[in-house]
Regions:
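Glycine-rich phosphate-binding loops of nucleotide-dependent enzymes
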Residues: 1-243
Length: 243
């Protein structure tokens, strides 16, 4: 895993006219993002991933500024996209190729790709995430939606990040897979990884996260922690009213 570091946002503005956000996310912390669709939580997550530019302020991990996706990855940030079919999987490629695309440089031996090293890496994450696939060279499209999502998560984890950004990670997966993923997320946090989870399901956020940032009109409308972590409180903040 990359060195543990704090993800910091200083006077971060995700849309013109919105209030700035100043936050830190510490190693081992799971922070949830909630809000009505289109109210800024997804843009905020993509800014943290270096996929979109903010209207103002900055994002840093340690002393490194995150100004692009490439810099985010190099600094120990991994991002799991929301729509696995459109922006995650490569549908014409195998399970193994989909897994290994982000770590090709780590599987090189004397300037040549080591297929054995690549397969060993895949098998390690296959076992950790309980990926069910007929064989590594099977098409990724032969897998269930839940197992496709596990392959994408394995791809992100193979980068050995310090910070994992998850965009609706259980969207469209079965209940059994959800609980496998929940256990994985908790284990990663226990090992010191910081996680930021955007979810369209409030109960999921409350189940997994230490605190919740609720977005409304492109800014953080509320930060909810401790005994206030209840569905009614989150929903009230989403609609701009008191709980």
């Amino acid at each position: 895993m990359a060195d543990r570091a704090t993800l910091s946002m200083r006077s971060l503005v995700i849309a013109p006219g919105a209030n700035p956000v100043t936050q830190t996310i510490a190693p081992g912390e799971i922070v949830g993002l909630a809000g009505l669709d289109g109210h800024g939580q997804e843009r905020f997550l993509k800014v943290l991933a270096g996929l979109e530019r903010p209207a103002g302020g900055d994002v840093t991990i340690g002393a490194r500024a995150i100004t692009s996706f490439r810099k985010a990855v190099a600094s120990g940030i991994a991002y799991l996209p929301r729509d696995r079919r459109a922006t995650g999987i490569f549908p014409t490629q195998s399970v193994l190729d989909n897994f290994a695309v982000s770590t090709l440089s780590r599987d090189m031996r004397f300037g040549l790709l080591s297929f054995a090293a690549r397969r060993r890496r895949y098998e390690s994450y296959r076992d950790k995430l309980s990926i069910v696939a007929p064989r590594p060279d099977a098409s990724i499209t032969t897998l269930s939606g839940g197992n496709q999502q596990k392959v994408l998560l394995a791809r992100a984890l193979a980068l050995e990040p310090a910070i994992l950004l998850l965009n609706d990670p259980t969207r469209g997966v079965d209940v059994a897979t959800r609980h496998v993923l929940y256990d994985v997320f908790r284990g990663l946090a226990a090992d010191g990884m910081a996680l930021v989870i955007l979810s369209s399901e409030i109960e999921e956020i409350l189940l997994l996260c230490h605190r919740v940032l609720v977005f409304r009109e492109q800014q953080v409308a509320a930060e909810i922690t401790g005994d206030e972590m209840k569905s009614d409180t989150v929903i009230a903040a989403m609609f701009g009213r008191a709980a």
